[in-house]
Regions:
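A residue-level detector for the "anchor" residue at the start of short, highly conserved motifs
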Residues: 5-257
């Protein structure tokens, strides 16, 4: 029955989520002073002014823009719950697609000799090129150092692995005291239990297509697929038969949420 449900969910006549009564949870922006803005409730206009930065919201995208000069740096935190997603254009023009159940902490403006953000969960980054100021994504297991490139980071705290997938450019990944070079079409995987690291060639669309609103699974375990869907649609999965977790599926289509 579970397999039939999954098949209907991905390949049925109606798109996923179209008539299932799924409502996107609140997406919140925490300002430096601790105040929280519920972005789902905010009209598309200027949200606030932070020092010399103007923050606006449109089409599920926050945009930070310079409106003056200041040495003041403040940190904002963008948080999505299960079923939610949001994008942010940082002060340097870097665009970040934040997936469900994820948190991104970042400065309202970048000063100093690097651009650093902190991620828990999953995000896709399109980093503005700056050879003099590397962009660094920090997770609990990896530091990803780039200067201008596109890549996906999957760093959920309750997952068994942390994965960074490079679409184009080049990245340096600092992990377990070592630095690893990752090239386009490669993925670096950190196994949390064994502390092991591997770099392998992958189909990047399997890991990055979500940011364009599509899913793609290729010979993927049912448990892994349903774990992903549970985040996208804020549902809990209960297995009456544990053996079905190992069944594998190949499917692709549009995400509607």
């Amino acid at each position: 029955m579970l397999v039939a449900f999954f098949t209907l969910l991905l390949n049925g006549p109606e798109p996923v989520g179209s008539d299932h009564g799924v409502e996107c949870p609140k997406v919140q922006l925490q300002l430096a002073d601790g105040n929280l803005l519920d972005l789902d409730d905010v009209k598309e206009n200027n949200l606030t002014e932070i020092a010399h930065i103007n923050v606006s919201s449109s089409n599920k995208t926050l945009t930070y823009q310079h409106i003056g000069k200041s040495s003041r740096v403040e940190y904002n935190t963008l948080k999505t719950e299960r079923g939610g997603e949001w994008n942010v254009v940082l002060e340097d023009g870097t665009k970040v697609y934040l997936n469900s159940s994820s948190t991104l902490k970042y400065p309202t403006s970048f000063t100093g000799d690097s651009r650093q953000v902190v991620l828990e969960g999953e995000a896709y980054f399109e980093v503005t090129h700056d050879p003099d100021k590397p962009f660094i994504v920090k997770t609990s297991d990896m530091n990803i150092v780039v200067r201008g490139t596109s890549f996906n980071v999957n760093a959920y705290s309750d997952y068994k692995t942390t994965r960074t997938t490079l679409v184009n450019g080049k990245i340096e990944v600092e992990c377990s005291g070592n630095t690893h070079i990752v090239l386009p079409g490669q993925q670096i995987v950190f196994e949390k239990e064994t502390k092991s690291i591997k770099i392998e060639d992958v189909d990047t669309e399997l890991y990055a297509s979500w940011k364009n609103g599509f899913y793609k699974f290729n010979d993927t375990r049912l448990e892994d697929i349903l774990t992903t869907l549970s985040l996208w649609y804020d549902v809990d999965v209960i297995y009456a038969d544990e053996s079905v977790k190992e069944l594998r599926f190949t499917s692709s289509g549009k995400i509607i949420r």
